[in-house]
Amino acid sequence: MLSELGFIRTIGEDEDVQVEPETDSEDEEEEGPIVLGRKQKALQKNRSADFNPDFVFTEKEGMYDGSWAMADVLSQLKKKRAATTLDEKIEKVRKKRKTEDKEAKSGKSEKEKEAKEGSEPEEEEDLERKDVEASEDEESETDYSSADENILTKADTLKIKERKKKKKKGQEAGGFFEDASQYDENLSFQDMNLSRPLLKAITAMGFKQPTPIQKACIPVGLLGKDICACAATGTGKTAAFALPVLERLIYKPRQAPVTRVLVLVPTRELGIQVHSVTKQLAQFCSITTCLAVGGLDVKSQEAALRAAPDILIATPGRLIDHLHNCPSFHLSSIEVLILDEADRMLDEYFEEQMKEIIRMCSHHRQTMLFSATMTDEVKDLASVSLKNPVRIFVNSNTDVAPFLRQEFIRIRPNREGDREAIVAALLMRTFTDHVMLFTQTKKQAHRMHILLGLMGLQVGELHGNLSQTQRLEALRRFKDEQIDILVATDVAARGLDIEGVKTVINFTMPNTIKHYVHRVGRTARAGRAGRSVSLVGEEERKMLKEIVKAAKAPVKARILPQDVILKFRDKIEKMEKDVYAVLQLEAEEKEMQKSEAQINTAQRLLEKGKEAPNPEPERSWFQTKEERKKEKIAKALQEFDLALRGKKKRKKFMKEAKKKGEMTAEERSQFEILKAQMFAERLAKRNRRAKRARAMPEEEPVRAPAKKQKQVKKSVFDEELTNTSKKALKQYRAGPSFEERKKLGLPHQRRGGNFKSKSRYKRRK
């Protein structure tokens, strides 16, 4: 009765209710093999269809609800017409391959049926049913059979790499900064004399205690002094320079609409991140910020610069472009100049641009220079741009994060071609999500994206060949867990704070240890645990030894079963045709877009005709084309980069490349290592170069004096004879000591000799 009316009836005392046992899916996934765990995840995704996908939690109160930092910039970017993405091309090729495999299998089954025409009809029906079931299983599951799963579920072996203990010859020379930065360890944000709007923003962002670099920098920055600070990545440098700058702007409001603060950053993504943090810190005050980085719309940036924002965050190239082509924009009113990641900006092609920007800035300014490592170039820049700077050294960037677990996989000699197979095995079997894979070149990153995508993994890529929209979209998808693996070059190795990165894999060892520390610094950030796995060949053993020597925690060597590597190597060889097919689709699409663009321009010219307005003047630059060409040639790594010199060399290189054809796996790996070695060689040459002569010697920071070792006094013949001091004379008269006599084997000499005192004589009586 109650059930008919729609009511829930009560349970009686005598009734037994079946309670389903609770299972923890996460525990099951960890215990079971990872290949099978992938299927369970797919089933769980299908189960989530019971819930309404449109359901959204209510937004947090306040202007900034902790949403993604780059979402605003991504919305501003112009979205091009929907062309097929790389993932769509990969999916198309995968489907084509699957249909071909099915057709081949169905052809085999038909032949078997023809061979067994004389069999009973019941047996035929059973065979048909089995074939249908098998095909359904193949569609739902991955491409692996039960035999493959037995190989794939073999466990890797881990060994602890012990470093060879050697006697220390002496303390190594430290960096340029002395480790004597005085700051109050108990200092809080409330004790820093910051304005209420800033304290409110700090609380809204969830900051509780300042980091060491913030405790050291903010009080000095508020005094208006120049700062030369050295701190590792992920230590809160952005807030360390943003808070004193914002406090200065609030305390001293502007009289005229001018830009007063300039922040220079090396990469676009880091610029967007700094802009986002600054905007959030200034959310409760009327300070305006502007972002001028490459890849974004030039016209909208020019309009924003005409409005004279208080703070400008820019990359060097785009800033110089605006300075030479935007008439109303200048840097003569800059009060504070901030150089973030200065060592990175002077590493490659920014040196001349940095000098040009500093030349155009106001001379009466406060300058803050932040650098992870202090090179000679940074030192030169500091001597030119800073006036009586306060040197702050909190922590060097030569150490990895404390909770990072470092693992290395040895690549045997003549086995360099196994790198792709090993990476694929790691990503398919062990590290399935929240992984960053670093490669040396853009070409290899693109290839790994295609290869892993064809294996059915959710992959994205991030490198310099992509447009700004594609780069930000890849970061957004990785952050939102739409993709599990992000393949990147060193563009993503600096400054980017990507939440939840569990594992970093190095396809090859990077150029220097400094680059290695930056790469593995993407994980184990802010006290979290993380893991790095690096593939090390014979030519990279020297760097491995240095890393093991510097490591505080034990370093482990991971050994993959040979069966697994061979299995994935065979699979990659079979996929080469599919990789080529995806690359062909990309090339065709590029040609189509190019021809469409030419047709559109021709149509526009025909429509406008002679009445067309004069074209816009070309954008000027501080260097001529020849000067830029010379600079590129000087910094080129190898011969094909030197093709910039002329058409003949370029044609010659292209002919040789066509003759060779497609590179093998061994050649690709060697090419990656070669690039890293050439960079390291160039760096070594630069370090050997004679330093610039100066009229006045620079003030070197006073290094901590080395501990004096107790020197054993050695007797010297001439010194004993010529030393006429009171102490030496007394020692000479006393003769050798008891210990010296013992060493020389002399008998113990009684001081008194045979002389008997009166007291002794009296006792005998």
Curated annotation (Swiss-Prot):
It comes from Bos taurus (Bovine). The gene is DDX27. This is Probable ATP-dependent RNA helicase DDX27. It catalyses: ATP + H2O = ADP + phosphate + H(+). InterPro entries: DEAD/DEAH_box_helicase_dom, DEAD_box_RNA_helicase, Helicase_ATP-bd, Helicase_C-like, P-loop_NTPase, RNA-helicase_DEAD-box_CS, RNA_helicase_DEAD_Q_motif. Associates with PeBoW complex, composed of BOP1, PES1 and WDR12. Interacts directly with BOP1 and PES1. Belongs to the DEAD box helicase family. DDX27/DRS1 subfamily. It is found in: Nucleus, Nucleolus; Chromosome. It is an enzyme of class 3 (hydrolase). The keyword Phosphoprotein applies. A motif (Required for interaction with the PEBOW complex) lies at residues 55-57. The modification Phosphoserine is found at S25, S48, S135, S146.
